[in-house]
Amino acid sequence: MDEDKGIDSKESGEYEDDFEKDLEWLINDKEKSNGSMIEVACKKEDDLDQELKEKETETELGPQLSDPDKPPKDEALPRRNDFISVPSIQPLDPISDSDSENSFQDSKPENQKDLEDEEDEEVRRYIMEKIIEANKLLQTQEPVNDKRERKLKFKDKLVDLEVPPLEDSDTCKVLLENETNMSGKLSQLCISGDLGQESMLMSVTNGGCEENDRKILVERDGKFELMNLQDIESQGFLPPISSANGMEHESSQLPLRSANLSVGGIKKEEPEAKIHIMTLSQAGEPLAQVPQPPANPKNRPSSAANPDLNKKTRRSSHRIQSAGVSPVTSTYCLSPRQKELQKQLERKRERLKREEEQRKLEEENEKKKENEMVFKAWLQKKREQVVEMRRVQRAKQIEDMSSRQVNRDPQQAFRLWLKKKHEEQMKERKTEELRKQEECLFFLRGTEGRERAFRQWLRRKQIEKIAEQQAVKERARQLRLEARRSKQLQSGLYSVPEAKAFRFTDHYN
């Protein structure tokens, strides 16, 4: 697991370095392209002139041919966008070339040499023209924008959380010593039983040690404990193990099923296997016994296989153990400062959560207020609409009444008025009768009271009769007046057109 992480971090670091180097190289080349390419062209011209002179001298003296088109070392390095490919001629071996050239120059005519010189000059001119064109293209190119956002980004730190080393060096040393001692003891003897989630690792000490010091490292539910060997035997986890003072040359083979548990770098074992327990002689020296393979090769434990083939499985087992614990809940491996930072983060989260809840409550209250205001505005608008409708209805009723008064018939109006008056009189009569009954009940206490009440009643009757007669007379009088008025109006309407018809009018005088 660690090796994979190291390889991944190394590859990502190399990729990042290459990416940054390419960017820096592009930027530097773009900045230096304007001035450097002109200087390179000038240097090429000088080099070409020198090579021509050297070639002329060599042809006279007969030395070996030199390569006139060989570029300098500085420009031989490949580049990506600013690279200019120049055709080059491979140099020949100096010893073999000198002999072959001398023999070839003797047979070659002078005209052929002149043609080759002209071809070389044409090649040089073509190369120079290409270089000048490339320089012009580089000068016309736009500079690279350094402020643009990169598509590929990398973190400053590949690991978000780093656990600092232990501050106490003494404790580290003690832990390392304990681990080395324990690993040495575990290499002597390893007994594992399938008893739930418990695994026991036993180490047998030398013969000089006392029996009280013999302890076994026991794992129970992920916790390690040092327990006495006698306690383990009394609990029935292990058979009694012979000590230095016990029987000589005695070995016991126990077929046990190994549980799927591991401590440190010990591999989990699933199949059953026979574990040989080393015994001690009287002198305290252990008898060396070579472990024998099991009878059934199919049930061979996985630890007996090739370690190179089991690397992936071992890595996966470590991964399974380490991935079972959450880094948030397990604070035993954090420093005090990291714990304090974690507490601060938790406080910050709680504070943000409270602020979010408070903000939500405020938003809800604001929404309620807005809804109430909108409802009040809607209610006020409805009330105004109702008032306006009532006012319009009242205006319509007044208009209808006025139109009825203008166009009504007088006889129909009189009949309506008479009916209304009759209803009012009937109501008055009922009220009067009720009042009289009350008075009669009040005065009926003797003969004198009865006579007095009778006289009062007779008087009221006479008054009512007189009032009715007067009302009838008044009504008859009004009817006569209305009839007379109607007759006068009708006679006036008929008389006016008759008079106008027989009258002469002179419009010119």
UniProtKB/Swiss-Prot annotation:
Molecular function, one GO term: microtubule binding
Signal peptide extent: none
Keywords assigned by UniProt, alphabetized: Cell projection, Cilium, Coiled coil, Cytoplasm, Cytoskeleton, Flagellum, Microtubule
Subcellular location: Cytoplasm, Cytoskeleton; Cell projection, Cilium, Flagellum
GO cellular component terms listed in the entry, alphabetical order: cytoplasm; manchette; microtubule; sperm flagellum
Polar residues: bias regions: 319-333
Biased composition annotated in UniProt, kind: Basic and acidic residues: 41-58, 67-82, 337-368
InterPro entries: CCDC181
Superkingdom per UniProt: Eukaryota
Stretches assigned to coiled coil: 335-377, 418-488
Chain positions covered by the region annotation Disordered: 27-122, 287-368
Biological role: Microtubule-binding protein that localizes to the microtubular manchette of elongating spermatids.
Assembly notes: Homodimer. Interacts with HOOK1. Interacts with HOOK2. Interacts with HOOK3.
Family: Belongs to the CCDC181 family.
Protein name according to UniProt: Coiled-coil domain-containing protein 181
Protein species of origin: Rattus norvegicus
Lineage of the organism: Eukaryota, Metazoa, Chordata, Craniata, Vertebrata
